[in-house]
Amino acid sequence: MLIKLLTKVFGSRNDRTLRRMRKAVSLINAMEPEMEKLSDDELKAKTNEFRARIEKGESVESLIPEAFAVVREASKRVFGMRHFDVQLLGGMVLNDRCIAEMRTGEGKTLTATLPAYLNALSGKGVHVVTVNDYLAQRDAENNRPLFEFLGMSVGINLPGMPAPAKREAYAADITYGTNNEYGFDYLRDNMAFSPEERVQRKLHYALVDEVDSILIDEARTPLIISGPAEDSSEMYKKVNKIIPHLIRQEKEDSDTFQGEGHFSVDEKARQVNLTERGLVLIEELLVQEGIMDEGESLYSPGNIMLMHHVTAALRAHALFTRDVDYIVKDGEVIIVDEHTGRTMQGRRWSDGLHQAVEAKEGVEIQNENQTLASITFQNYFRLYEKLAGMTGTADTEAFEFSSIYKLDTVVVPTNRPMIRKDLPDLVYMTEAEKIQAIIEDIKERTANGQPVLVGTISIEKSEVVSRELTKAGIKHNVLNAKFHANEAGIVAQAGYPAAVTIATNMAGRGTDIMLGGSWQAEVAALEAPTEEQIAQIKADWQVRHDAVLAAGGLHIIGTERHESRRIDNQLRGRSGRQGDPGSSRFYLSMEDALMRIFASDRVSGMMRKLGMKPGEAIEHPWVTKAIANAQRKVESRNFDIRKQLLEYDDVANDQRRAIYTQRNELLDVSDVSDTINSIREDVFKATIDAYIPPQSLEEMWDIPGLQERLKNDFDLELPIAEWLDKEPELHEETLRERILAQSIEVYQRKEEVVGAEMMRHFEKGVMLQTLDSLWKEHLAAMDYLRQGIHLRGYAQKDPKQEYKRESFAMFAAMLESLKYEVISTLSKVQVRMPEEVEAMEMQRREEAERLAQMQQLSHQDDDTAVAADLAAQTGERKIGRNDPCPCGSGKKYKQCHGRLS
């Protein structure tokens, strides 16, 4: 009450922000007459004038009124479209490192041209990020004429493009692409073998469209580049045969409870666990199949990989459903994105889950993959100096944007007031009753000529509704992952009078639904339309448009509530754009997933006691409130999962930054001999220490062991025992110096054979190859550590702190291994001719190319995320030699991981 009163007196933070920005809007409007007087050439010349002013030290922010006025005038001349005042406000919000919440149909694409132009003036590049390739291409092509009129270059970054084309796209002033492609390019750049192979520039400004979808919905799933590991397809087939013998444990209070089952399913956490009874049975079955020896336990250390196979197979059978989580097409299991309902061609679940699903479906099992590089979207987008985003629905997630990305959310007012009617939810007892009620509503609406959009949460549900509509003889279009190609066309015509469109999880975001259909799509379908044809099409469209307005605009039907209120709001937001009329209603049943998991059994009990008849529905604000509370529970759980994932990934992120910084420094220099000499000293000191402890008596020295180690690991045959016999005065310090000097001398003789330049090239290649190989193994070890770390909680230890401590110890050990491997390889490889170095280089490149072709780009299903409380690092700054090392050891960078560089 008090907060409401204070808000009325002082205005909310949102109001104060907009009030401040409206002053700048008045300035832009005042400049309009002046801009209109400029010729095209004078308007174009403004870009170079702004660039010159920035070079002289003027800030980008000081140019806002003038730059925005220039873009608005250019848009009027190129597109015949003038930015509304609310779009200017949106542009300022986006430049202010904030998230602009703009309703559907308010022209987000045109709004984005303002901050994109302004931030591209510095010449550092702007990345516009979209959710799919179609939108990236569409927005780039639509806005290209405007940017090129103003002297700006536009690039498109698409999957599968060759490196030179990608480099050109990134070199443009403004680059359009998808979140996945930007992330994968970053990872690939950090796997490159020469500076020329890298495609990205320094990450400057990212403008994220549908920011909620990218930074929240997809933030639980890291981007992973993986390569093939060993073949274990037979094991998946054998384990898959066993799983159908197991019975699922039902809840004790359920109607179907039959005592203890063999495994329990936690739908909330998406986990499956064996019960005591299940463990006994599965061990018997594994012994029968000859997979495990009698008397062995599934939990013994030697059966860790077998346990991994059993868990993956159980999850595949109990948690992943065909046509909901994946589809089978042409003998291949293709993942369906749970957030967009689109198929994700070429993506694979990791941890053996994809292979287990392939075994379950009886299709060919493809090899398991090993992680080569990975990053989460949270950590990728925080590398940008400046980040902003826009969406129609961000306010419900404002806290998460603020706490994780340090982005404030500003709600931008609509150009015209919103008049859509959002009707209360209707709750039915069963799914069948609900579907029947939906069909009746559709019949009623379409009889009046009103278009209807039906939103479903899975392909399976969309096909159920489609079948019922077909039975009822109602013509309709289905829009889901299976009919991806003609998506935009179907959405564009969804506003036709009496049109019925079924869409999964609002596939088709980014395309406006025009009331009366899209006359532009009709014109585009004609080969060479005449003026008369275009005029006729527009006239016909106007008649249809008016008819739909009279019928009440677009009606939205939700077939069930999503886990997130935001996705429900996105569905509703398809109607009522730009002040158009419209309506929306959600139909629910007690059999819906959300109601089953989160709405208590008391609700269904209460409905039965009230004596509800079949086909009757409850419609009450209390019910709507209870559902909103259930959604809040899911949202906060999902937020905790993402926060957990981020905290854990922050530990890995600091290590990743240290390795990638080091790797890039290595790539950019041609001579690493100083580094090699420095680490040779460290390696030989550690090796000698193992056999001659410092300040020890000669009786404690293990000279035969040292000689053998030097010969085996460094190809160095030294008569150390002979030296000690012949020179009694030879003490420990002098001996150490002599061994090191001998190793340097042998190495220099090798260098004389091939020449200094070729040797430098060889050293760099060996360092890169060894670093990549050990980093890959380290990532796998970190994965295994993370999967089991939560068990430390049972020992009264904080899993997060344990993960930090152990991963740092592993990282330090990896760096020691790196030094040792590099010196050992350089010492052992016999190079006699320069051609041999070239041949080895060629072999390395061929291997890298072979791996690149076999690489899988995946979005891991990471529900077991865990994590560390480290401050967010913004921008990929260069680490100073005296700065604290980012790995968290507390040492200076030069004394820790900086020693390698």
Curated annotation (Swiss-Prot):
It catalyses: ATP + H2O + cellular proteinSide 1 = ADP + phosphate + cellular proteinSide 2. ATP binds at residues 87, 105-109, 512. It holds the Pfam family SecA_PP_bind. The keyword Coiled coil does not apply. InterPro entries: Helicase_ATP-bd (IPR014001), P-loop_NTPase (IPR027417), SEC_C_motif (IPR004027), SecA (IPR000185), SecA_CS (IPR020937), SecA_DEAD (IPR011115), SecA_motor_DEAD (IPR014018), SecA_preprotein_X-link_dom (IPR011130). Gene3D superfamilies: Helical scaffold and wing domains of SecA, P-loop containing nucleotide triphosphate hydrolases, SecA, preprotein cross-linking domain. Disulfide bonds: none annotated. GO terms for cellular component: cell envelope Sec protein transport complex; cytosol; plasma membrane. This is Protein translocase subunit SecA.
